[in-house]
């Protein structure tokens, strides 16, 4: 399972992440849009997205592959423009734990592959602790 939390210019975007029949993940509606200063709403949006799981969707063909759903909420037309001023936290869940992959900070291109901070949450309250950790990191990034 997988989820994304994006921060761009003071706005937090938390899309639903669907899994295609082919096995890859794409961001889909609904997308929560929250001000980065509102810790409680960030936490609620993350919990809601995780609660929705990863719905299964048909694999789009190359011709019908949609633009990233978060672009319209960020008021940009291209992924390249979006990622210039955005950070992405990725949450992965396996059988026993959640992993939080935090973005590289203070680097020219934080989206490039490279070392990231990975935290593991395997307690009973993992979703609560994970959501609070992301909200605090988001607020510390602004």
Write out the residue ranges for each language-model feature.
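Intrinsically disordered, low-complexity regulatory segments enriched in Ser/Thr/Pro
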Residues: 1-37, 93-132, 136, 140
């Amino acid at each position: 399972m997988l989820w994304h939390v994006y921060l761009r210019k003071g706005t937090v975007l938390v899309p639903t992440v669907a899994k295609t029949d082919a096995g890859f993940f794409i961001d889909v509606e609904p997308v929560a849009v929250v001000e980065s200063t509102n810790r409680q709403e960030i936490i609620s949006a993350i919990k809601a997205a995780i609660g929705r799981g990863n719905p299964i969707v048909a694999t789009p063909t190359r011709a019908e592959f949609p633009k990233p759903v978060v672009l319209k909420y960020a008021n940009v037309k291209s992924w390249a423009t979006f990622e210039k001023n955005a950070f992405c936290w990725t949450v992965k869940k396996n059988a026993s734990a959640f992993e939080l992959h935090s973005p590289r900070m203070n680097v020219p291109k934080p989206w490039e592959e490279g070392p990231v901070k990975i935290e593991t949450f395997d307690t009973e309250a993992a979703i609560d602790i994970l959501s609070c950790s992301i909200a605090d990191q988001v607020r510390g990034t602004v």
